[in-house]
């Protein structure tokens, strides 16, 4: 007679790439919280209206909180959420080309005001508005641009190697 192999519980990992904190939580299938960790990534304001943070530091903090909650656990699914718009401009190797820009950033406001023809008014913190600014203000870096990612999608790409987003973020990119 062969005894069944013991199975480990199937667990779920939630990862929130927020604008102030990065949080990871592990749940069991009944919704009980088994582990929770959080970390902070400093935000920079190098000029009036600019709000940035280091995308590589964001990745390091995200990886650290995931390690803390998942160590010794069998994670079977991962869900990501993030802090709205903004943009992380990366090259083909997912290397950030500059500091990441948070959605509260206003540097592209002049571009938004110039485009009065739009039926849906964009706002300065949307990826589309930020792309216009990036191409005009940092053309050398913009020539190496391969992907414009939302914050959670940058972390997802680093976790999985897959560049993707969801319909809600894509529709709000501007």
Predicted regions and their residues:
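N-terminal glycine/serine-rich phosphate-binding loop of ATP-dependent small-molecule kinases
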Residues: 1-99, 144
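Pocket-flanking alpha-helical
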Residues: 110-114
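Carbohydrate-associated surface elements
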Residues: 105
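Gly/Ser/Thr-rich active-site cleft segment
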Residues: 17-19, 118-174
